[in-house]
């Protein structure tokens, strides 16, 4: 029996018969692929249960869920808060006017971890602090009314200063899962200068209107270690979009059901809960509202 890797551990449970995990045990990133065909209809987001639940994680470490396929679909890049204990689901959207079938092995899914901070931000009306104590994302509000036309993308400008409070953590914008389940997704982007430019997609067949003050996306203060430097070609990284490359945290994802080392010391039986604890409410991060 080989010794366990000496790094932070994240425990998860996997119960799906529709997906298989393709990453090795104790990998720093969980990868999955579908075992059966998945039908993605036009204009209607497909919410796909993956059979994964995070059982125990570490404070200050969130998760990112990403998907990819060669077919004409768009996978919402999901932010999963460390306190979320519900089943993790991938949101897939059809980019065409016709049914798209993802046959076995054509959908690839990744779940990985990152370090974040939730600093206190003063005099900033557009950001709202995380709803739960373990949440990573600050809600960002629209400055003015927004209209999204069917099957089209729109560029939105947020004319506001960069809310950076420390050089070690950089603000990154993620879309909201609640909007993605309604067909509206936002490109992941680093907030490096002012004004902030967002690219928003409407994959429905309806014109959608959002008033000023609507929660349109989330801002997460991600540790700068996760962004490639000039040495990026010497490390393994993932592209969150065409412009944002990302290193995931060097942790061990441990399957609770197949863990030869499992003990009461390494895996607490029950986590402390209070009113500020997310549990299985919401959709992993920003909720459904």
Curated annotation (Swiss-Prot):
SUPFAM superfamilies: dUTPase-like. GO terms for molecular function: dUTP diphosphatase activity; metal ion binding. Substrate binds at residues 176-178, 283-284. Keywords: Hydrolase, Magnesium, Metal-binding, Nucleotide metabolism. Its cofactor is Mg(2+). Pfam families: dUTPase. It catalyses: dUTP + H2O = dUMP + diphosphate + H(+). One of its GO terms (biological process) is dUTP metabolic process. It is an enzyme of class 3 (hydrolase). Its EC number is 3.6.1.23. Involved in nucleotide metabolism: produces dUMP, the immediate precursor of thymidine nucleotides and decreases the intracellular concentration of dUTP to avoid uracil incorporation into viral DNA. Belongs to the dUTPase family. HAMAP family: HSV_DUT. This is Deoxyuridine 5'-triphosphate nucleotidohydrolase. It comes from Equine herpesvirus 2 (strain 86/87). The lineage of its organism: Viruses, Duplodnaviria, Heunggongvirae, Peploviricota, Herviviricetes. The gene is DUT.
């Amino acid at each position: 029996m080989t010794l366990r890797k000496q790094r932070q551990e994240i425990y998860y449970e996997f119960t799906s018969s529709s997906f298989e995990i393709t990453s090795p045990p104790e990998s720093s990133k969980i990868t999955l692929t579908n075992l059966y065909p998945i039908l993605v209809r036009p204009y209607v987001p497909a919410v796909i249960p993956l059979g994964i639940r995070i059982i125990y994680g570490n404070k200050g470490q969130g998760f990112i869920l990403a998907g990819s396929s060669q077919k004409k679909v768009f996978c919402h890049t999901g932010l999963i808060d460390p306190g979320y204990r519900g089943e993790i689901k991938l949101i897939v959207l059809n980019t065409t006017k016709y049914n798209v079938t993802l046959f076995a092995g054509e959908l690839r899914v990744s779940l990985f971890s990152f370090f974040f901070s939730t600093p206190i931000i003063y005099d900033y009306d557009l950001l709202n602090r995380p709803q739960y104590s373990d949440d990573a994302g600050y809600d960002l509000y629209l400055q003015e009314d927004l209209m999204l036309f069917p099957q089209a993308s729109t560029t939105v400008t947020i004319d506001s200063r960069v809310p950076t409070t420390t050089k070690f953590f950089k603000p990154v914008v993620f879309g909201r899962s609640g909007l993605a389940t309604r067909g509206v997704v936002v490109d992941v982007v680093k907030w490096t200068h002012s004004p902030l430019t967002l690219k928003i997609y409407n994959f429905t067949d309806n014109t959608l209107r959002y008033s000023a003050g609507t929660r349109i996306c989330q801002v997460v203060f991600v540790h700068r270690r996760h962004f490639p430097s000039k040495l990026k070609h010497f490390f393994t990284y993932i592209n969150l979009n065409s412009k944002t490359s990302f290193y995931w945290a060097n942790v061990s994802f441990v399957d609770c059901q197949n863990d030869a080392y499992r003990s009461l010391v390494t895996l607490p039986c029950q986590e402390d809960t209070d009113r500020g604890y997310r549990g299985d409410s919401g959709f992993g991060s920003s909720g459904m509202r």
